[in-house]
């Protein structure tokens, strides 16, 4: 296979399909999504067999347990995939929405219309469900998609892709609206991210190494986040009853997600009173605390086991652990907390626990991250929790989409003008 020619063909087909999708009716798009869901349910046995083949090859290759866990698809997971497609079908269609229409002194009316981006390239690792999720969101937002999944999920991704094509055909839409790259050759990624004539935006979902490579080499705009060093700051005016539940949920509900808290900041005035209880909770959960001198002194005095405590290094303040580890620092006040976050954060999600309205509003205004919260767990930074229905990923960039990227994030707006024969004087 000539990879260059193959990727060029995918690109041309996607561009042609995108023009059809841009004018496709909501009814046709929804019909395709519902038909995809039906095909996935009908092909449950085939999907499980394809996944078993992927798992056998993954174990033979000695892949780590965490990767195999992400790769594993169950009957319950397949049903959730089908339900996800149906849920996207039930979301409002953003395409064609007209907003902000204003009449100008000249007599013309000026507004904006929401339109698809065009062709979206999505690069992801060993998560077969992403194939269906990405197909659904791109289709509903009127975009064609080229999907390049991890080589570990090749067989399962191909089986899901067949269900997607079945759904598209049933609704009379081009089967090339969603194409899954059929080669594991890494050169395919290099071509996908350097085809601006065919691809309008790239969305990478995976490890930091993958995203750094794509950001460095892409000649196409990229919607991305590198990592999730999320902070929780306990203010001097925090409600004690809220502190431990928020920290517990933000850190320990799931360790491997990008919206998990990795750093805890505590105001000096309340640290001696609040840190011991937080520390006992974290130690009970098996979390290692990497602290500054002040925090370690407080935690040791509270009887926290030595094997759960460790002196923090400079690197710890910017680390995304994705593990039962958290960096802990005592800060003088809100000013130092904001400065620390804006220095070390990855720009993903930060939270303050406080009953002080002025402090809360300062935190919201001055912390430079894609999601900023007051008295809530960082784990809420999610498209579903934000009412977007579903998300393609989370962006920490400041241009175009920022934060959870749902259907609207996969669209743009163009200016539209209504006139009645007006000419410019």
Swiss-Prot record:
Catalyzes the NADPH-dependent reduction of L-glutamate 5-phosphate into L-glutamate 5-semialdehyde and phosphate. The product spontaneously undergoes cyclization to form 1-pyrroline-5-carboxylate. This is Gamma-glutamyl phosphate reductase. It is found in: Cytoplasm. Pfam families: Aldedh. It comes from Aromatoleum aromaticum (strain DSM 19018 / LMG 30748 / EbN1). GO terms for cellular component: cytoplasm. It catalyses: L-glutamate 5-semialdehyde + phosphate + NADP(+) = L-glutamyl 5-phosphate + NADPH + H(+). The keyword Chloroplast does not apply. Keywords: Amino-acid biosynthesis, Cytoplasm, NADP, Oxidoreductase, Proline biosynthesis. Pathway: Amino-acid biosynthesis; L-proline biosynthesis; L-glutamate 5-semialdehyde from L-glutamate: step 2/2. NCBIfam families: PRK00197.1, proA. InterPro entries: Ald_DH/histidinol_DH, Ald_DH_C, Ald_DH_N, Aldehyde_DH_dom, G-glutamylP_reductase_CS, Glu-5-SA_DH, GPR_dom. GO terms for molecular function: glutamate-5-semialdehyde dehydrogenase activity; NADP binding. CDD domains: ALDH_F18-19_ProA-GPR. One of its GO terms (biological process) is L-proline biosynthetic process. Its EC number is 1.2.1.41. Belongs to the gamma-glutamyl phosphate reductase family.
């Amino acid at each position: 296979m000539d990879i260059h020619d193959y990727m060029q063909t995918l690109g041309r087909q996607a561009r042609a399909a995108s023009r059809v999708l841009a004018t496709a009716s909501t009814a046709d798009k929804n019909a395709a999504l519902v038909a995809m869901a039906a095909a996935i349910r009908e092909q449950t046995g085939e999907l499980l067999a394809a996944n078993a083949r992927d798992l056998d090859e993954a174990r033979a290759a000695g892949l780590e347990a965490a990767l195999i866990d992400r790769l594993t698809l169950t009957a319950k997971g397949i049903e959730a995939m089908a339900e996800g497609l149906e849920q996207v079908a039930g979301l409002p269609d953003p395409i064609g929405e007209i907003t902000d229409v204003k009449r100008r002194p000249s007599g013309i009316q000026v507004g904006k219309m929401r339109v698809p981006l065009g062709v979206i390239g999505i690069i992801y690792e060993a998560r077969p469900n992403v194939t269906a999720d990405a197909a659904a969101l791109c289709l509903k937002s009127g975009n064609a998609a080229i999907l390049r999944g991890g080589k570990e999920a090749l067989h399962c991704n191909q089986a899901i892709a067949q269900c997607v094509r079945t759904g598209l055909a049933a609704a009379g839409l081009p089967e090339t609206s969603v194409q899954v790259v059929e080669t594991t050759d890494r050169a395919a990624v290099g071509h996908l991210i350097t085809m601006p004539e065919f691809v309008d935006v790239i969305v990478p979902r995976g490890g930091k190494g993958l995203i750094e490579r794509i950001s460095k080499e892409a000649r196409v705009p990229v919607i991305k986040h590198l990592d999730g060093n999320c902070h929780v700051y306990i203010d001097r005016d925090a409600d004690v009853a809220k502190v431990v539940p928020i920290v517990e949920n933000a850190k320990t509900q799931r360790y491997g997600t990008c919206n998990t808290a990795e750093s805890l900041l505590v105001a000096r005035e309340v640290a001696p009173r609040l840190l011991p209880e937080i520390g006992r909770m974290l130690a009970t959960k098996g979390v290692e605390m990497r602290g500054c001198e002040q925090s370690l002194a407080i935690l040791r005095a509270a009887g926290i086991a030595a094997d759960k405590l460790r002196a923090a290094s400079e690197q710890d303040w910017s680390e995304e652990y994705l593990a039962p580890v958290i960096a802990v620092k005592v800060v003088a006040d809100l000013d130092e907390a904001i400065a620390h976050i804006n220095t070390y954060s990855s720009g993903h999600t930060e939270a303050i626990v406080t009953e002080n309205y002025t402090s809360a509003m300062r935190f919201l205004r001055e912390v430079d991250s894609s999601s900023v919260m007051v008295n809530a767990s960082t784990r809420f930074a999610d498209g579903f929790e934000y009412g977007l229905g579903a998300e393609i990923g989370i962006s920490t960039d400041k241009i175009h989409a920022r934060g959870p990227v749902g259907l609207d994030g996969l669209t743009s707006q163009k200016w539209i003008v209504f006139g009645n024969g007006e000419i410019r004087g």
